[in-house]
């Protein structure tokens, strides 16, 4: 924490100061544009981030698009929910295995081509192989 941020936190009487921003995108469709149970995954994400990092905030659906290069560059239009979570780099590193497990579970169970997240200014993407619908 910088000195000016520390001073500002003291002036406000802040009991907690976190400076690492984690942004998670919860999809509304799978890679074949079929709807998923987004509400369940938003709840699971909030629960996971709350347990791991102390809290998170979900924002209403937006509009997005993702290019699925595995399917010839097909565009998948989506209405993602964006979740913000402030934490510390130390806690993020300590909880990385549990966060990754949640992201992989969501990606696999909702048949995503990828799950994207942002940590501070870095966009990260976990990719999933193209599977046939019957591979369940």
Placement of each model-derived feature along the sequence:
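Positively charged, small/polar-rich N-terminal and surface patches that mediate targeting and assembly
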Residues: 2-136
């Amino acid at each position: 924490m910088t000195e000016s941020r520390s001073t500002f936190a003291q002036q406000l009487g802040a009991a907690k100061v976190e400076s690492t921003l984690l942004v998670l995108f919860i999809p509304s469709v799978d890679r074949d544009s079929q709807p998923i149970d987004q509400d369940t995954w938003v709840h699971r994400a909030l629960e996971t981030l709350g347990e791991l990092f102390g809290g998170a905030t979900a924002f209403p659906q937006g509009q997005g698009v993702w290019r699925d290069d595995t399917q010839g560059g097909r565009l998948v239009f989506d209405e993602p929910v964006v979740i913000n979570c402030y934490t510390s780099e130390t806690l993020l590193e300590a909880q990385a295995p549990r966060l990754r497990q949640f992201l992989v579970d969501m990606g696999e169970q909702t048949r995503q081509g990828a799950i994207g997240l942002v940590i501070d200014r870095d966009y990260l993407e976990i990719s999933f192989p193209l599977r046939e619908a019957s591979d369940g």
